[in-house]
């Protein structure tokens, strides 16, 4: 098996790269940081925790609206998803080798240029209100929510959406929190696997990943 290269970038991010011919002409990436929603803290709006990933899905990235970005990703055969879990934040994606420059640019923009999108937000607020109004009448959703609560030991942080939590959700505050979680490259490990030569990958890492903003401190998760 081929060796794994470990690169420590100037901004404190760590890159683990393994060349692999398992999937021809493709690169996969996972960026993982510690902390996640556990950093919301007891003083801030706890209801935001249930909607962080909805906020991510309905925000613009690098000037692309959510629908424009979906279209671009589809056209270029790129996958790209970001999320915030209870104890981590992550970005994962894959791209064909001929789209690597665009892919790394989109990864960079996902960290640095995420903004609210008014049209997407208003559609989301309308649809979510309808969904949550109907939720209590769905035996399947009630069952799913019950399982989630049990899994989280009835914690207040169990990601169960309801009209009550939605009424307390603050969109701007949640978006600011998401951006804060992705504002410290020093906190991230990038795991990259693909059918690509190191000579081709390294300049992209140096141009995009190494220039991500950093606070030069490592985060951890808060025990809730």
Predicted regions and their residues:
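N- or domain-start disorder-to-order transition segments that initiate the globular core
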Residues: 2-24
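A common structural junction motif
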Residues: 108-118, 208-216
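An aromatic/glycine/proline-enriched structural segment found at the starts
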Residues: 154, 184, 189-224
């Amino acid at each position: 098996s081929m060796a794994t290269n470990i690169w420590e970038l100037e901004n404190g991010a760590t890159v683990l790269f393994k060349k692999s011919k398992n999937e021809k002409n493709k690169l996969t990436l996972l960026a993982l940081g510690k902390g996640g929603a556990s950093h919301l803290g007891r003083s801030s709006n706890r209801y935001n925790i249930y909607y962080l990933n909805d906020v991510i899905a309905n925000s613009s990235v690098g000037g692309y609206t959510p629908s424009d970005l979906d279209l671009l990703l589809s056209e270029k055969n790129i996958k790209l998803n970001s999320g915030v879990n209870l104890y981590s934040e992550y970005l994962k994606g894959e791209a064909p080798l001929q789209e690597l420059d665009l892919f790394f640019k989109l990864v960079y923009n996902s960290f640095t240029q995420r903004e609210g999108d008014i049209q997407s937000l208003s559609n989301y607020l309308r649809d979510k209100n309808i969904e949550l109004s109907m939720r209590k009448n769905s035996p399947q959703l009630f069952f799913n929510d019950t399982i989630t609560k049990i899994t989280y030991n009835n914690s207040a942080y169990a990601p169960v959406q309801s009209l009550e939590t939605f009424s307390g959700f603050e969109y701007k505050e949640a978006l600011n929190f998401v951006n804060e979680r992705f504002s410290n490259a020093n906190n991230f490990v990038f795991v990259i696997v693909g059918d690509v030569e190191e000579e081709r990958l390294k300049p992209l890492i140096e141009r995009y990943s190494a220039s991500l903003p950093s606070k030069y401190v490592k985060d951890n998760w808060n025990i809730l």
